[in-house]
Swiss-Prot record:
Residues 69-90 are annotated as: Disordered. It is a single-pass membrane protein. It is found in: Membrane. It comes from Penicillium oxalicum (strain 114-2 / CGMCC 5302) (Penicillium decumbens). InterPro entries: Cyt_P450, Cyt_P450_sf, Cytochrome_P450_monoxygenase. One of its GO terms (cellular component) is membrane. Its EC number is 1.-.-.-. This is Cytochrome P450 monooxygenase opdB. Pfam families: p450 (PF00067).
Length: 497
């Protein structure tokens, strides 16, 4: 009754008892409700007070300031800032109005994916704002659950290894044509590995997807669309109010650029589809688009956004991987010589099978690619993915629904997995590492439960390996500290064998 009296006084009720039992029962019910509310609030407050702390009460480190766009524009500096502040422990950063947990150690990656990985979600617009959502929101990389599975169902067939392997002879011809254009001199040629390789994967991926519909005219149209894409990404990264629908509605220049891209991209595909169907052309993209037809489960927006992600989002990424591959081969003559010898030995076999060589994981060819992608992963910081359950990550209590980001560059150099020489280019390190260590300690297209989910990985791997084969077979590579070609800033010298 003491509690009821206290609540009565708090609520301003008198102590009159003329209504007897009825008023007492009423006040009792009110008191019970208030007590339940207070208890629930206290329990919730207690739970929240434990969020982002260890069981001993240590609070997780938070990086000050808005780091949303810094993850892309100042990746190295932000990564170093996080390491200086938190060491190897997880930390929080602010991504616009959202908080994201950053992890960088194999055990933390294991904690993140353990038990609930199949139920992970992704934050709206990947926490990148309204314009990003209008641009790439429906793409497969931004989806999860049934929507993700639906898009994958339509896109996976042409990206399976068997489909890609059938394209190897055509890829080789295109790579040889490209080499002839970039290295026309009989003896010595120079390449700027950051520029000259930029559109090679892009071109061969386009060839793979459009097949009979791919020609010089369509390629130039795609290059023009890529320029628009770059402008839109710049708009997104420079937006002052990315989460404001009203601001983005009246931000005319970025809105106009986005609309121009969307209309041209849609019309480009509709024309290709019309021609492919009318002419009976082989065109994997047209087969994918059949999922958009009436009574099917793929929307045109999801189709176009996923095509945007596959083609345009990987242009600069693939160029960086090529730069890492060839600059390190040029700097390591012994690795280059060993790779050339391996290629020659494989090709001298009576039963030589090029797709089989490309698929093998125990070759130096594969190890060079793996080591290059360890050093140059797709993104320094991964896209956010949300925990389904409350869990401990790196000893901290992390609430359900927390967006988690992986510092990929630190993960790929961590001494726990890679020893003290993680910054040294050494393809043979993959000889010594058990596959279990790589599952949560290495990220190129994905890590943990995400390994192998990148749609274009088979095409990209094939193009990287085929290009290595063609270049190393025909040229000896040297580092070019000073370009011998006027007006060029070449960093690699190709000397004909």
């Amino acid at each position: 009754m003491a509690t009821i009296t206290l609540v009565q006084q708090f609520l301003g009720f008198g102590q009159e008892q003329e209504d007897g039992g009825m008023k007492t029962r009423y006040l009792g019910a009110m008191a019970g409700s208030v007590i339940l509310l207070i208890s629930a609030f206290t329990l919730s407050l207690g739970r929240r007070s434990k969020d982002f702390t260890t069981d001993q009460g240590k609070r997780i480190t938070e990086i000050p300031g808005d780091s949303r766009m810094s993850k892309f524009t100042r990746s190295r500096e932000l990564s170093q800032q996080g390491e200086d502040a938190a060491g190897t422990e997880p930390y929080l950063l602010q991504s616009g109005p959202y908080r994201e947990l950053v992890i960088s150690q194999p055990d933390q990656v294991h904690d993140f994916y353990q038990h609930d990985s199949k139920r992970h979600t992704k934050p709206r617009n990947l926490n990148l704002g309204e314009q990003f959502g209008s641009f790439l929101g429906p793409c497969v990389g931004g989806e999860y659950g049934d929507h993700w599975r639906t898009i994958r169902k339509h896109f996976e067939p042409p990206f399976a290894f068997h489909s890609v392997a059938l394209r190897a002879p055509r890829f080789r011809r295109e790579i040889n044509d490209w080499l002839q254009s970039k290295a026309p001199n009989l003896r010595v040629n120079e390449l700027d590995s950051k520029i000259d390789f930029r559109f090679l994967v892009f071109k061969l991926l386009s060839l793979h997807l459009y097949e009979d519909a791919f020609d010089d005219r369509s390629y130039w149209s795609l290059l023009e669309l890529n320029d628009l894409y770059d402008g839109i990404i710049t708009d997104i990264l420079n937006s002052k109010y990315p989460d404001s629908k009203l601001f983005n509605l009246f931000c005319w220049s970025p809105k106009k650029r986005l609309r121009e891209f969307q209309v041209k991209w849609r019309d480009f595909h509709r024309l290709v589809i019309e021609n492919a169907r009318g002419g009976g052309w082989a065109c994997p993209m047209e087969v994918i688009y059949r999922g958009v037809d009436p009574q099917k489960d793929l929307t045109e927006n999801a189709f176009l956004a996923t095509m945007t992600e596959i083609l345009f989002a990987n242009v600069n990424i693939s160029a960086e991987v090529f730069h890492t591959i060839f600059s390190n081969l040029a700097s390591n003559p012994s690795i280059q010589t060993a790779l050339r010898k391996e290629i020659q030995e494989w090709k001298s076999r009576l039963d030589f099978d090029l797709p089989k060589y490309l698929a093998k994981h125990d070759t130096l060819l594969n190890r060079v690619l793996m080591e290059s992608m360890r050093i140059s992963p797709a993104f320094w910081f991964s896209m956010p993915e949300c925990t389904a359950d409350a869990k401990k990550i790196g000893q901290y209590n992390i609430p359900a629904g927390t967006p988690v980001v992986i510092d990929t560059r630190r993960l790929n150099n961590d001494a726990v997995t890679w020893g003290t020489t993680g910054d040294v280019f050494n393809p043979d390190r993959f000889f010594k590492l058990p596959s279990q260590s790589l599952r949560c300690g290495f990220m190129r297209y994905g890590t943990g439960a995400s390994s192998g989910r990148c749609l274009g990985k088979n095409v990209a791997d094939a193009v990287f390996k085929l290009t290595m084969i063609e270049v190393v077979e025909r040229f000896r590579l040297e580092s070019a500290s000073e370009s011998q070609e006027k007006g060029r800033e070449g960093d690699i010298r190709l000397i004909s064998l």
